[in-house]
Design a protein with these regions (language model features):
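Active-site region of the double-stranded beta-helix
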Residues: 92-93, 118, 123, 134-144, ...
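Non-heme Fe(II)-dependent double-stranded beta-helix
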Residues: 1-14, 20-114, 120-122, 159-160, ...
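A short beta-loop-beta micro-motif enriched in histidine and acidic residues
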Residues: 90, 116-128, 179-180, 186, ...
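Non-heme Fe(II)/2-oxoglutarate
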Residues: 38-41, 45, 159-160, 191-193, ...
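Short, solvent-exposed loop/turn segments at secondary-structure junctions
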Residues: 24-25, 102-104, 109, 119, ...
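Double-stranded beta-helix
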Residues: 9, 138-201, 223
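Short, surface-exposed loop/helix-turn segments at secondary-structure junctions
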Residues: 116-117, 164-178, 208-210, 229-235
Length: 262
C-alpha cells in the first residue's frame, strides 16, 4: 500500500487521514474473532449491565496490550505495512510501538466524548499517531470516529481528560474556531490514522451489533519521556515506559521498533 504526497500533506494539514482498502477483508475476518475473544475474556467490567456503567464504560470496552495476550494478535500489531504508513505520515525514519488496544462499543453504547489522546501520554514531541482499524464495516450509526479537521494545530483542551467536561469544552471551541467535523462510514479494510493532538470523538452505537475496533499507537523511535504532568500520564509511564528516566528515549521491552526505513 503506497501513500501519495497528497496523502501525506493532507494528514499533516488535517491531523488525520482515512485510507481505503489498507488491509484485505480476509485478514480482518481472521483476526476479529481472536481479538473479540481476548477482549471479552479480559473485559474489566464483565457482567456489568450497560446502563450501570459510567460515561467511559458506556462509550466502549477497552483492553490494552493485546499483543502480549496472544501471538496471533501480535502479528497484526507488528504489521510492517501499518507501521510504515505511520512512519511516513509523521515523517520519521522509524517508529516504535507505544501500545495497542481494543475498543468495543456495545450495542446501544454511548458516545465517546471529544478528547485528544496525547494528553494521556508523557511524550516530549508530537511525533505520534494512532491507527484505528475497524473489524467490520462501520456505518455512521455504529459510531465510527469523527475528527476535527486541523485541530491538532489549535492547542484546544490539551489538559482535559475524556469526560462530559471535555465534550462540552471542545464542542464550544469547535464552534468558536469554526473547525470542520468529519465523520464517515468505514468499509472493512479501511484504516484511519490520527495525530496524538487531533480532536476526535465517536457517536453512540444505535445498531444491534457491537462496533469492534482495534488500535495501534506508534511513536517516533527517538521519542523521549517527559516529566509527567498528571496522574493519567503517570499511569501511562508506569504501564508502558518501564524504568525509562525523564528525558531518555522510551525504548523498553514494551515499546519495540516496528519499522525502520531502509
Amino acid at each position: 500500500y503506497s501513500l501519495t504526497s497528497d496523502d501525506v500533506q493532507a494528514f499533516r494539514e488535517d491531523g488525520y487521514i482515512h485510507l481505503a482498502g489498507v488491509l484485505p477483508d480476509a485478514v480482518l475476518e481472521y483476526y476479529e474473532p481472536i481479538i473479540s475473544k481476548i477482549t471479552q475474556e479480559h473485559d474489566p467490567a464483565a457482567g456489568v449491565a450497560l446502563e450501570d456503567k459510567d460515561l467511559y464504560g458506556k462509550a466502549f470496552i477497552q483492553l490494552g496490550n493485546l499483543w502480549q495476550h496472544n501471538a496471533q494478535v501480535k502479528e497484526l500489531v507488528f504489521c510492517k505495512r501499518l507501521a510504515r504508513l505511520a512512519s511516513e505520515l509523521i515523517g520519521t525514519a522509524s517508529v516504535r510501538l507505544y501500545h495497542d488496544q481494543s475498543l468495543y462499543k456495545e450495542p446501544s453504547g454511548g458516545i465517546t466524548p471529544w478528547h485528544v489522546d496525547q494528553q494521556y501520554w508523557p511524550m516530549d514531541s508530537s511525533k505520534s499517531v494512532t491507527a484505528w482499524i475497524p473489524l467490520q464495516s462501520t456505518p455512521v450509526e455504529m459510531g465510527p470516529l469523527c475528527f476535527g479537521r486541523g485541530s491538532h494545530l489549535k492547542y484546544i483542551a490539551r489538559d482535559v481528560k475524556i469526560s462530559d467536561e471535555s465534550e462540552r469544552i471542545i464542542t464550544q471551541a469547535i464552534k468558536k474556531e469554526k473547525i470542520i467535523e468529519i465523520q464517515e462510514p468505514y468499509a472493512l479494510g479501511d484504516v484511519s490514522f490520527h495525530s496524538g493532538w487531533t480532536l476526535h470523538r465517536a457517536g453512540g452505537n444505535t445498531t444491534e451489533q457491537a462496533r469492534k475496533a482495534h488500535t495501534v499507537i506508534y511513536m517516533d523511535e527517538q521519542m523521549r519521556l517527559k516529566e509527567t504532568r498528571s496522574q493519567n500520564q503517570e499511569n501511562d509511564r508506569i504501564s508502558w515506559c518501564g524504568d525509562t528516566a525523564d528525558g531518555a528515549v522510551i525504548n523498553g521491552p514494551l515499546t519495540p521498533i516496528l519499522y525502520r526505513a531502509d
